[in-house]
UniProtKB/Swiss-Prot annotation:
It comes from Prochlorococcus marinus (strain MIT 9215). The keyword Disulfide bond does not apply. HAMAP family: Ribosomal_bL9. GO terms for biological process: translation. This is Large ribosomal subunit protein bL9. Pfam families: Ribosomal_L9_C, Ribosomal_L9_N.
Length: 151
């Protein structure tokens, strides 16, 4: 069996791993593809230290993002209820529905902080009343907000 070469990836490669990972590959793959195209570099003590420092910085940045999400979750629970005004027909049914975009606008208006509508899950809302929407603020942090739909 052929000897394998250990390399540090400089960019993410679907079949191998993500940037900064240490991988073992066939010598020909390393020599003919990864090294010439700058997708990996040989492992040296200096490279290992560099990868370690980069991972520490990424961990600090990820912790900061999580803390910001937790703070925003607290702010949302402090506000408590968001009101959305919609037009209503004679029988009390809304013209259209309340979408995650409507909820995002209401939250942005109240908190002055932009939120991606794709992270908001809203039940089917066709009537006036109170409803609960779920928001994914971070992979580990979710929030629930109360929505009051009025005419």
């Amino acid at each position: 069996m052929a000897k394998r070469v250990q390399l540090a990836l400089t960019e993410s490669i679907a079949s191998l791993g993500k940037e900064g990972d240490l991988v073992e590959v066939a010598p020909g793959y390393a020599r003919n593809f990864l090294l010439p195209y700058g997708k990996a570099m040989n492992v040296t003590p200096a490279v290992l230290k560099q990868i370690e420092r980069k991972k520490e910085k990424e961990k600090i940045a990820a912790d900061k993002l999580k803390q910001e999400a937790l703070d925003f979750q607290t702010a949302l629970s402090t506000i408590g209820r968001f009101t959305i005004k919609k037009q209503v027909g004679e029988d009390g049914v809304l013209f259209g529905t309340v979408t995650n975009g409507d909820v995002a606008e209401a939250i942005e208006e109240a908190t002055k902080k932009e939120i991606d509508r794709r992270n908001i899950t809203v039940p089917d809302i066709h009537n006036l009343g109170s409803f609960t929407a779920k928001i994914k603020l971070h992979p580990e942090v979710n929030a629930e907000v109360n929505i009051e739909v009025t005419s």
